[in-house]
Amino acid sequence: MYLKRILITLSLITLPIVPCLSYAAESISNVGINNTGSTANLAPAAADANVSASDKHEESWWQRSKNNLSTTWNAPQSHDIYIPTITWHNRWTYDKEKTDRYNEKPWGAGYGVSRLDKDGDWHGLYIMAFKDSYNKWEPIGGYGYEKRWRPTSDQDFQLGLGFTAGFTMRDNWNYIPIPVLLPLASISYSKLSFQATYIPGTYNNGNVFFAWFRWQI
């Protein structure tokens, strides 16, 4: 019940922002949802396809951000399951006595929606909860973006680099919502992605590698 309450609290903080942005997409025609088995075949959102080069040039960064959030929320191409996999505390920045007692198995799960835009880049909204360094539940939710590269002839194999922005809540901070802006990287093949971030910090604080699997359903 405690975990359920904090997840509900986090969703109330992060998710209502997105529907408020939906007005940005009201003039856009309905976007079909393509749920094909391969990420290489995911059809880019019609909203993106209808934006001319001149319109895109005139569009502000803030407006583009709102449009991306709104389109991802209203017209996702896939629904995703998140499985936290590893947290690793950088041994160069921690005393051994601390890392010896920290938890590095972030048991948990999450859910999200995502899409590829007309350039083949990834946009996602997600919420997940996992066991933190002190083995306490930590929820996190937000928006993720990755520029995608397809270095081989197999278009299902993709590399990604971008960022995630959202909110998290921790037991040792009394579950006060804390904004986060972190780097994001991934290796993907078809429906499966291995995504990771690095939380910077100071000595004995932060400097944590956190990774998870994302599976399109």
Curated annotation (Swiss-Prot):
The keyword Cell membrane is annotated on this UniProt entry: no
Active site: 89, 132-133
Gene3D superfamilies linked to this entry: 2.40.160.20
Gene Ontology terms: cellular component: cell outer membrane
Classification via InterPro entries: LipidA_acyl_PagP, OMP/PagP_b-brl
Quaternary structure, from the entry: Homodimer.
Assigned keywords, A-Z: Acyltransferase, Cell outer membrane, Membrane, Signal, Transferase
Residue numbers marked as site, Role in the phospholipid gating: 203
Family to which the UniProt record says this protein belongs: Belongs to the lipid A palmitoyltransferase family.
Protein name: Lipid A acyltransferase PagP
Source organism per UniProt: Pectobacterium atrosepticum (strain SCRI 1043 / ATCC BAA-672) (Erwinia carotovora subsp. atroseptica)
Biological processes per GO annotation: lipid A biosynthetic process
Superkingdom: Bacteria
Site (Role in lipopolysaccharide recognition): 98
Annotated EC: 2.3.1.251
Function: Transfers a fatty acid residue from the sn-1 position of a phospholipid to the N-linked hydroxyfatty acid chain on the proximal unit of lipid A or its precursors.
Pfam family, one: PagP
Transmembrane residue ranges: none
Chief location bin: membrane
